[in-house]
Design a protein with these regions (language model features):
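Active-site metal-binding motif and surrounding structural segment of the metallo-beta-lactamase
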Residues: 48, 123-172, 188-190, 258-264
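Metallo-beta-lactamase
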Residues: 13-138, 174-242, 261-268, 319-341
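Acidic/histidine-rich helix-loop elements
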Residues: 112-132, 213-220, 271-280, 307
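Catalytic core of the metallo-beta-lactamase
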Residues: 98-104, 199-261, 277, 281-285
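A short acidic, amphipathic alpha-helical/loop segment
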Residues: 158-163, 184-185, 249-253
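Cap/insert and terminal regions of metallo-dependent hydrolase folds
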Residues: 14-40, 136, 144, 151, ...
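Bacterial N-terminal signal peptides
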Residues: 2-12
Length: 345
């Protein structure tokens, strides 16, 4: 146990520089990246270590069970709807932050995660509570994959390799992940800095600032950038938040790129607040972010799939819908999908 505590403490304290590089963007620092919100604070190393230990214990010896509502989806409609002749844009919740989006002939995935655990270890770490809403084998042809950051619940290397082998999509990632993926044998990758963009098969993809952090090992904290994504077609605009705390970046994205037809925002992993408050949104903050983004439809994601935090596992959608109702947002504009559910947007 002392060795484990030492390892976790080192992981919690590992960091890059904090001062912006002369002449560079304000989020670039020596050896990596930082959040630019002057109010941003990360908990001290001991607080993070205590949390990591408590989560390791809970996931190993005191795991909670929960299964989010789900519907069967054999992928037939999605496969028949792929391509330029589809009847309209669709979105399918596979689970956690994994969405399958069909828009104007492009079929894309966000933060694809089909593994049993969100962990570097096959035998430990957060276990999937609900199977994916689509079996990997029934996916339609995937043209594009967006990855928000390198945490294991968002960048699952086994899934990425399977997608590269089976579909050969273009992976679009924040700065620093292209070389890392190349080292894993995944080479069809383009990386972007905040506010950078590219065109792919007629849709525009924009890398949007987020307030979070990155880390996959003891020594690489914040060496790779984190981001949200905007996907802009001729008829629809999608905002995918990935992981982010609430900050002024939502308002900026709404002003520069909005209004958005659909905003997919994380509503889970917000307790304890001393750990989560700057890097994850509460359900109420997600509703505020939706309004900042000038959204038409709010979709709550990042809940009910992995046990990552301490709030009741079924609480996030209840709080999101209650806050949306309190603000006068009608039910047809505040969505909680069942795992596997597809809707037109």
């Amino acid at each position: 146990m002392p060795t484990l505590v030492t390892i976790l403490l080192l992981a919690a304290c590992a960091a890059v520089g904090t001062e912006p590089l002369p002449g560079g963007p304000p989020h670039h620092v020596q050896g990596g990246f930082r959040n630019t919100n002057p109010e941003f604070r990360r908990p001290d190393g001991w607080t993070r270590t205590r949390f990591l230990l408590s989560r390791a214990w809970a996931n190993t010896f005191d795991s909670r069970s929960f299964e989010a509502p789900r519907v069967a989806n054999d992928g037939v409609a999605l496969r028949s709807g792929a391509g330029p002749g589809n009847p309209g844009p669709t979105i399918t919740w596979v689970g956690h932050s994994t969405l399958l989006v069909q828009l104007e002939g492009v079929t894309l995935l966000t933060d694809p995660q089909w593994s049993e655990r969100a962990s570097p270890l096959s035998w430990a770490g957060p276990r999937r509570l609900s199977p994916p809403g689509l079996a990997f084998e029934v996916l339609p042809p995937i043209n594009l994959v967006l990855i928000s950051h390198d945490h294991y619940d968002h960048l699952d290397l086994d899934t990425v390799k399977r997608l590269a082998a089976a579909h050969d999509p273009l992976f679009v990632v924040p700065l620093g992940l292209k070389s890392w993926l190349a080292g894993q044998g995944v080479t069809r990758v383009q990386e972007l800095d905040w506010w950078g963009s590219l065109e792919h098969q007629g849709v525009r993809v924009v890398c949007v600032p987020a307030q979070h952090f990155s880390q996959r090992s003891l020594w690489d904290a914040n060496t790779r950038l984190w981001a949200s994504w905007a996907v802009i077609g001729a008829s629809r605009r999608l905002y995918f938040g990935g992981d982010t705390g609430y900050f002024d970046g939502f308002r900026q994205a709404g002003e520069r790129l909005g209004p958005f037809d659909l905003t997919a925002l994380a509503i889970g992993a917000y307790r304890p607040a001393e750990i989560m408050r700057f890097t994850h949104t509460t359900p109420e903050e997600a509703v505020q972010a939706f309004e900042d983004l000038r959204g038409r439809i709010l979709l709550g994601i990042h809940w009910g799939t992995f046990d990552l935090s301490e709030e009741p596992l079924g609480e996030p959608p209840e709080r999101m819908l209650a806050e949306a109702s309190r603000r006068g947002i009608p039910p047809e504009r505040a969505w909680i999908l069942k795992i596997g559910e597809t809707r037109y947007w």
